[in-house]
């Protein structure tokens, strides 16, 4: 049976942590900041951890 291919779109967007979690950049950060509060903009910086219910699906896409 051939090896499963990694979904390249997912591999470019998500990183698997050492403990098996998945982190990604926040959405809603490319434009239209004038409509967001200072608190919203501050909280959108950096990365976020994916919730437990969707991690299994994304591990299948990433083959990890």
Curated annotation (Swiss-Prot):
GO cellular component, one term: cytosolic large ribosomal subunit
Source species, domain of life: Bacteria
GO biological process per UniProt: translation
Gene3D superfamilies, A to Z: 4.10.410.60
Coiled-coil blocks: none
GO terms of molecular function: structural constituent of ribosome
Keyword tags: Ribonucleoprotein, Ribosomal protein
Family statement drawn from the similarity comment of this UniProt entry: Belongs to the bacterial ribosomal protein bL35 family.
Protein name: Large ribosomal subunit protein bL35
Origin species: Levilactobacillus brevis (strain ATCC 367 / BCRC 12310 / CIP 105137 / JCM 1170 / LMG 11437 / NCIMB 947 / NCTC 947) (Lactobacillus brevis)
